[in-house]
Amino acid sequence: GILPFKQVGIQVIEDQELIPVGSPIGIYVKTDGVLVVGTGDFKREDGTECSPCKYVLKSGDYIRKVNGETVTGKEIVLTLERDGELLELAVTPEKDSTGKYKIGAWVRDNAQGVGTMTYIDSQGHFGALGHGIADVDTSMLMLMEDGTLYETNIVDIKKGTTGTPGEMTGMIVYSNDHILGDITSNSSKGIFGNCNEKALAMGTREPLPIGLKQEIKLGPAQILCTVDGSAKYYDIEITALHLD
């Protein structure tokens, strides 16, 4: 007789080693366009309320282009990205109570913060955070044009509690002398990019082989973290796993 065989796809992952870091970093990210975080009302010259962008713009839109001219009361066309699709929408600015033209949109074009560099690989690439950079108002992953890593001094650490994550507060000096590298990607798994010589000097520990998520077990483990000025290993306990 004939025995049927089921075909199964197999993905082979090459052995890879990464240098663990655990040092704090300052992060600056410029958005790919101007992020719309909301719309709002304002008063016209006659005191009545208006909101030109209401029902036109949505939180999470990225404005890519405007007319490129001085804003007047004439209709303007905004080129924006929404859910991966480019759109052209018209808005007519209104004069506010001070005589300035507005469209009634709250926008943001950058994000800053502090985090932890997770690893450096043999090609000088880094991975950091372990989660993406999301906008604080929309909670959406930010579309990034470019970004920069900086040195930072941690001035305060708040311990996490159940339902509330811990927090690091740091001081960042945004100057060329303090740059550690450039950020090329912002994803749900973290931020990634390239290290300069100063950042490579942070990778002084021996490389470790990467592990697959299926290899993670409940029980004692260690994390590498900077709490008092230098990166050290700390004992932890893994009490639950969510692999999906």
Give short role names for the model-derived ranges:
Residues 53-72:
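Conserved PDZ fold ligand-binding element
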Residues 63-65, 77-79, 222:
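Hydrophobic beta-strand signal
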Residues 15-22, 69-72, 103, 206-210:
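N-terminal post-signal-peptidase region of extra-cytosolic proteins
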Residues 26-58:
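PDZ/PDZ-like groove recognition
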Residues 2-6, 13-37:
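N-terminal, Lys/Arg-enriched amphipathic/low-complexity engagement segments
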Residues 2-15, 73-105:
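PDZ-domain C-terminal substructure recognizer with occasional recognition of PDZ-binding tails
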Residues 44-50, 64-66, 103-104, 209:
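Second-shell loop/turn segments in exported
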Residues 82-83, 92-244:
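Serine endopeptidase catalytic core focused on the charge-relay Asp
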